[in-house]
């Protein structure tokens, strides 16, 4: 007696994608806004504005239909957290993917002009962290409203253009700009038209590391200058103030153009209260190194400076006791 095998005992046919174990698409939707992940080399990267949380997002997660995945995307709510997904093919081959979230800056294209406190408040409400143009603070109009507080600008990380301080700004310092790491330049007055910000005593941006253009500060009220983390200036550094008491650039290594500091008073006499100037890490000034008319200067030190375009100490004050440039070996023009 011969019996044929039942169809129920036959081995089922493998699906066409039995060897596949891929994640092909991840899309997350928050508040009607969809974000599509980039999948490269088994890394799933989804980029969202820093203000957006992906927790409890609506998720569309596509992977090989015959495969299994752990953990199950449907069981996850905390999508802000990095994790690993394992996709196992129908035939048992595992493939791991790393899921990552990048919280990106919010950028504004163009110039930002903040003339009033209301302007500052309205700008902060946009959550912008990177300005791709100039940041203009205050106004030069005769009837301009005074602006005294820019602390709310602490969310800013970068200004690709210039930061320009105009005369209606009456703050004592630049508190609010301390989290900016890179700028195109800083302008407070010019060499031919000094700024008249009567209360501005301190110019400081504590997180600033790089300037692609110039620092120009021409204001006789400025007494304190402090840039704790600034390393490179791709343009000029120009300071004109008759009230200078301290000048701190502890990490500055390179000035691509001129380094020019003067403290002439309004009647043309040497000024400033500063007695010691030391730029400890500066190694190169491509242009002119000029320090002049600091009336009470006793010690002037550039301990690591190796190369300059030229040196201009034409108006060295009579009290000067120490002038130290021990490593200077290259002067491309005049000494």
Language-model region placement:
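C-terminal motif of bacterial Sec signal peptides marking the signal peptidase cleavage site
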Residues: 2-4
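Beta-rich interaction/scaffold domains
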Residues: 6-124, 129-133, 158-161, 176-182
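Concave beta-strand-loop units of leucine-rich repeat
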Residues: 107-119, 131-152, 158-335
